[in-house]
Swiss-Prot record:
Compartment list: Mitochondrion inner membrane
Name used for this protein in its record: Cytochrome c oxidase subunit 6C
GO BP terms in the entry: oxidative phosphorylation
Gene: Cox6c
Protein keywords: Acetylation, Membrane, Mitochondrion, Mitochondrion inner membrane, Transmembrane, Transmembrane helix
Mitochondrial intermembrane side: 45-76
Subunit structure: Component of the cytochrome c oxidase (complex IV, CIV), a multisubunit enzyme composed of 14 subunits. The complex is composed of a catalytic core of 3 subunits MT-CO1, MT-CO2 and MT-CO3, encoded in the mitochondrial DNA, and 11 supernumerary subunits COX4I, COX5A, COX5B, COX6A, COX6B, COX6C, COX7A, COX7B, COX7C, COX8 and NDUFA4, which are encoded in the nuclear genome.
Membrane-spanning intervals of the chain: 23-44
Membrane topology field: Single-pass membrane protein
Chief location: mitochondrion
Family, similarity comment: Belongs to the cytochrome c oxidase subunit 6c family.
Biological role stated in the UniProt entry: Component of the cytochrome c oxidase, the last enzyme in the mitochondrial electron transport chain which drives oxidative phosphorylation. The respiratory chain contains 3 multisubunit complexes succinate dehydrogenase (complex II, CII), ubiquinol-cytochrome c oxidoreductase (cytochrome b-c1 complex, complex III, CIII) and cytochrome c oxidase (complex IV, CIV), that cooperate to transfer electrons derived from NADH and succinate to molecular oxygen, creating an electrochemical gradient over the inner membrane that drives transmembrane transport and the ATP synthase.
Transmembrane recorded as keyword: yes
Source organism phylogeny: Eukaryota, Metazoa, Chordata, Craniata, Vertebrata
All ranges on the Mitochondrial matrix side of the membrane: 4-22
Length: 76
């Protein structure tokens, strides 16, 4: 017997399409994971920090401090 009879024939058609299906699905899953990680790891904490800052922010107090420091030329 020859060794060629023991090995199955390799699939020659549709190799690229099969690999693309697998890799596109994997890329989609990775992209969703990265988007979720960014949203909950970066965007949500940033949004909470901005909300907390503006909840306690006094613009007139900030303006008066800048005016006393001499930043403005028109408001002395």
């Amino acid at each position: 017997m020859s060794s060629g009879a023991l090995l199955p024939k390799p699939q020659m058609r549709g190799l690229l399409a099969k690999r693309l299906r697998v890799h596109i699905a994997g890329a989609f899953i990775v992209a969703l994971g990265v988007a979720a990680a960014y949203k909950f790891g970066v965007a949500e904490p940033r949004k909470k920090a901005y909300a907390e800052f503006y909840r306690n922010y006094d613009s007139m107090k900030d303006f008066e401090e800048m005016r006393k420091a001499g930043i403005f030329q028109s408001a002395k």
